[in-house]
């Protein structure tokens, strides 16, 4: 079984004049780990926290890249050098685990301009774009998989919640009346569609947060140091990268 831990970075809202978002890009990233590596990932995260005197940090929801970089709670007592060292160790942890990386990056301005009022919400569309890429990977390796997501991701998005609910009965159906080139795919290798796990209990989701934020900064701000560090993890076959989708 392959677990795809999902986490997003960026505001899924529309930019002016259609909304109030101040950011152009929305990114959803997924880290695929074999089931047997879950305990290793959990222990590795705890080891890194202990190394930096943070073994008391048991709520993994607080293990967020943006929080560390800003020196916000609970990292306000750590100097910038210690925070950078912590971030370095976590990215090294991700690379050494050798997960398979997937992501979808949506330029919200171009997406809304191209499709107008018919444009899918970035939150929903990012999920729909990443699903078939993970499924094709599972077909290639003859494996089964499941999406793992924090329930907070769907709390304020009724359309995403509906998509996931329907997926449990009929799969992730990628079809649209205004885009006939989308596939009608039920993704039979995905088991139970989405498993919801509180992120404070899942180091996998929080490691996905580090990746999604690094990818978002690459597109939104042109800051690519961390992106380059993890780009080698992208699903690749015969020299072609299949793990990423930039839209439109």
Residue ranges and their predicted role:
Residues 1-248:
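Phosphate-ester processing/binding pockets and catalytic centers
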């Amino acid at each position: 079984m392959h677990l795809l831990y999902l986490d997003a970075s960026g505001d899924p809202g529309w930019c002016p004049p259609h909304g109030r978002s101040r950011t152009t890009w929305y990114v959803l990233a997924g880290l695929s780990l074999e089931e047997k590596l879950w305990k290793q990932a959990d222990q590795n995260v705890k080891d890194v926290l202990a190394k930096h005197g943070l073994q008391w940090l048991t709520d993994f929801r607080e293990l967020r890249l943006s929080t560390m970089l800003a020196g916000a709670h609970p990292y306000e007592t750590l100097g910038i050098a210690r925070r950078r060292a912590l971030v370095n160790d976590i990215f090294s942890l991700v690379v050494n685990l050798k997960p398979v990386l997937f992501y979808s990056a949506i330029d919200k301005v171009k997406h809304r301009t191209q499709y107008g009022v018919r444009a899918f919400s970035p939150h929903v569309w990012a999920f729909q774009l990443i699903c078939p890429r993970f499924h094709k990977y599972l077909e290639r390796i003859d494996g089964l998989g499941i999406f793992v997501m924090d329930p907070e991701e769907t709390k304020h998005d009724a359309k995403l919640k509906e998509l996931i609910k329907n997926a449990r009965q009929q799969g992730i159906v990628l079809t649209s009346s205004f885009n006939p080139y989308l596939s009608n795919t039920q993704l039979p290798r995905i088991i139970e569609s989405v498993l919801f796990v509180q992120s404070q209990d899942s180091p996998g989701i929080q490691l996905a947060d580090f990746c999604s934020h690094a990818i978002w900064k690459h597109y939104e701000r042109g800051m690519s140091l961390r992106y380059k560090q993890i780009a080698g993890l992208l699903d690749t076959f015969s020299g072609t990268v299949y793990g990423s989708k930039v839209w439109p």
